């Protein structure tokens, strides 16, 4: 191990540490960070060299953050990244600084961005918040209105998690939806992601995603938002149902086939007669 450490440059050590951090399971960032910190044994090198990994993790995970003075949480995503550690809260029309290591928001300030699609964004956000409240007890959503390639675009992000460290499991749901505001009809593009880690007496992870495409009729803001939510609800329900059914099928077939019904002797052990078996005698003499 000592020879290996001598062969690795600081750059290589940081690269390896960054990979561990970026792939940390949901809810386990601090544990992975602390382990990597012990392995690297150089806090300055870790903070400076792996800072991009801290940021990438929060962006990828749609990390929710509470801003002092504001009721609703906002998601940390690439769509709200204003650069220099600042992020946008489109609902409250503010920007704030975000510490990617501490996961804390500070210095909220008014932010008025030019957004011709604000009325559309607001309508979608209102409808999406109602949907999230109904379907995700711990859910958070953030809706952006941006101009992409000259087209007004709505981007809706949803995050919901359950962290149960005492029960040895953590999980997170993420979904991202986009559509451009064009006359008559437009295409809705979405991606749904599930990540779950179970680690009691083992180490099992579920990492799954599904891409979605559908057409959306564009009329006025309110009606379009309602139709958009119908697409979101149908797709997310179908995906979650499919995941559950697949696990049931695996339990009934794949996993069952892996389990041995009888010992190698093809005979069940009569535990009341264990002493008459050779193994029982060996245990007595041990």
From Swiss-Prot:
Modified residues (Phosphoserine): 9
GO cellular component: cortical cytoskeleton; F-actin capping protein complex
Positions of modified residues (N-acetylalanine): 2
Keywords attached to this entry: Acetylation, Actin capping, Actin-binding, Phosphoprotein
GO molecular function terms listed in the Swiss-Prot or TrEMBL record: actin filament binding
SUPFAM superfamilies attached to this UniProt entry: Subunits of heterodimeric actin filament capping protein Capz (SSF90096)
Gene Ontology biological process terms, A to Z: actin cytoskeleton organization; barbed-end actin filament capping
Keyword hit for Plastid: no
Domain of life from the UniProt record: Eukaryota
Xref: InterPro entries: CapZ_alpha, CapZ_alpha/beta, CapZ_alpha/beta_2, CapZ_alpha_1, F-actin_cap_asu_CS
Subunit structure and binding partners: Component of the F-actin capping complex, composed of a heterodimer of an alpha and a beta subunit. Component of the WASH complex, composed of F-actin-capping protein subunit alpha (CAPZA1, CAPZA2 or CAPZA3), F-actin-capping protein subunit beta (CAPZB), WASHC1, WASHC2, WASHC3, WASHC4 and WASHC5. Interacts with RCSD1/CAPZIP. Directly interacts with CRACD; this interaction decreases binding to actin.
Family: Belongs to the F-actin-capping protein alpha subunit family.
Role played: F-actin-capping proteins bind in a Ca(2+)-independent manner to the fast growing ends of actin filaments (barbed end) thereby blocking the exchange of subunits at these ends. Unlike other capping proteins (such as gelsolin and severin), these proteins do not sever actin filaments.
Protein name: F-actin-capping protein subunit alpha-2
Organism listed in the record: Echinops telfairi (Lesser hedgehog tenrec)
Lineage: Eukaryota, Metazoa, Chordata, Craniata, Vertebrata
Gene encoding the protein: CAPZA2
């Amino acid at each position: 191990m000592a020879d290996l450490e001598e062969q690795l440059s600081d750059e290589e050590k940081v690269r390896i540490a960054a990979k561990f951090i970026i792939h940390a399971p949901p809810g386990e960032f601090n544990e992975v960070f602390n382990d990597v910190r012990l392995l690297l044994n150089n806090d300055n090198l870790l903070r400076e060299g792996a800072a991009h990994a801290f940021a990438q993790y929060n962006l990828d995970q749609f990390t929710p953050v509470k801003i002092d003075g504001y009721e609703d949480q906002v998601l940390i995503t690439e769509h709200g990244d204003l650069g220099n550690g600042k992020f946008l809260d489109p609902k409250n029309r503010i920007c704030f600084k975000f510490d990617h290591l501490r996961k804390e928001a500070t210095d909220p300030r008014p932010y008025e961005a030019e957004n011709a699609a604000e009325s559309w964004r607001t309508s979608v956000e209102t409808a999406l918040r109602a949907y999230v409240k109904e379907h995700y007890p711990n859910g958070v959503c953030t809706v952006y209105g941006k101009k992409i390639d000259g087209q007004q675009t709505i981007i809706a992000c949803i995050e919901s998690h359950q962290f149960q460290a005492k029960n040895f499991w953590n999980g997170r749901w993420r979904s991202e939806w986009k559509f451009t505001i064009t006359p008559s009809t437009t295409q809705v593009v979405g991606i749904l992601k599930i990540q779950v880690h179970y680690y009691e007496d083992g180490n099992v992870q579920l990492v799954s995603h599904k891409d979605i495409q559908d057409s959306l009729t564009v009329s006025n803001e309110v009606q379009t938002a309602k139709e958009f939510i119908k697409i979101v609800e149908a797709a997310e329900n179908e995906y979650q149902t499919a995941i559950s059914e697949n696990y049931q099928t695996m339990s009934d077939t794949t996993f069952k086939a892996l389990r041995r019904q009888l010992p190698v002797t093809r005979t069940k052990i009569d535990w009341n007669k264990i002493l008459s078996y050779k193994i029982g005698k060996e245990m007595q003499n041990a």
